[in-house]
Curated annotation (Swiss-Prot):
Matching PROSITE patterns: CHAPERONINS_CPN10
Protein name: Co-chaperonin GroES
Species for this entry: Oceanobacillus iheyensis (strain DSM 14371 / CIP 107618 / JCM 11309 / KCTC 3954 / HTE831)
Subunit structure as annotated in this protein's UniProt entry: Heptamer of 7 subunits arranged in a ring. Interacts with the chaperonin GroEL.
Keyword vocabulary terms for this entry: Chaperone, Cytoplasm
Functional note: Together with the chaperonin GroEL, plays an essential role in assisting protein folding. The GroEL-GroES system forms a nano-cage that allows encapsulation of the non-native substrate proteins and provides a physical environment optimized to promote and accelerate protein folding. GroES binds to the apical surface of the GroEL ring, thereby capping the opening of the GroEL channel.
Length: 93
């Protein structure tokens, strides 16, 4: 498994629907980049004023993140995104 460092988080992307509400099938080129994912690994935390502070997200959280944030990586056939905690906008549910 990928173990992120510091304030980084590894997420597995949640793919968007392949068809519209009216039943039109969207080609890959028409789909927007996903902005939702599931946290699969969390770094050790960030350092502020010499103190280590734990991240606000944890493994299993569903999150929304900035549209162009992070670095895409493929590991053991699965696509992941590694991003910093400050690129996370919200935790869902």
């Amino acid at each position: 498994m990928i173990k992120p460092l510091g304030d980084r988080v590894v997420i597995e992307l949640v793919e968007q629907e392949e068809t519209t509400a009216s039943g039109i099938v969207l080609p890959d080129s028409a789909k927007e980049k996903p902005q939702e994912g599931k946290v699969v690994a969390v770094g050790s935390g960030r350092v502020e004023n010499g103190e280590k502070i734990a991240l606000e997200v944890s493994e299993g959280d569903r999150i929304i993140f900035s549209k162009f944030a992070g670095t895409e990586v493929k590991y053991e056939g699965t696509e992941y995104l590694i991003l910093r905690e400050n690129d996370i906008l919200a935790i869902i549910g």
